Amino acid sequence: MNDFVGPIVTVLTAIIGVAILAVLVSRNSNTAGVIKAGSGGFSSMLGTALSPVTGGTGFAMTNNYSGF
């Protein structure tokens, strides 16, 4: 079974890699905006996860989507 699944996973991974590369180098992509939004979301999740240890509230107000 591994002889069958391995090549399929390799091909699918290559297709996904090419798609990601195409999006990153496209003129119409907003790569910087996507990276900024992703890092802001990660920062918020990390702050929430560490809040019991650090004594924080767990709600980071660093992004533009917080309506508080």
From Swiss-Prot:
The gene coding this protein: XXXIV
Topology of the protein relative to the lipid bilayer: Multi-pass membrane protein
Broad class of where this protein is predominantly found: virion
Any single Pfam family the record assigns to this protein: PRD1_DD
GO cellular component: membrane; viral inner membrane; virion membrane
Organism this protein belongs to: Enterobacteria phage PRD1 (Bacteriophage PRD1)
Signal peptide start and end residues: none
Name the UniProt record assigns to this protein: Protein P34
Record-annotated membrane-spanning stretches: 4-24, 41-61
Localization annotation: Virion membrane
UniProt keyword Protein biosynthesis present: no
Entry keyword set: Capsid inner membrane protein, Membrane, Transmembrane, Transmembrane helix, Virion
Keyword Disulfide bond included in the entry's annotation: no
The organism's place on the tree of life at top rank: Viruses
Coiled-coil ranges from the UniProt annotation: none
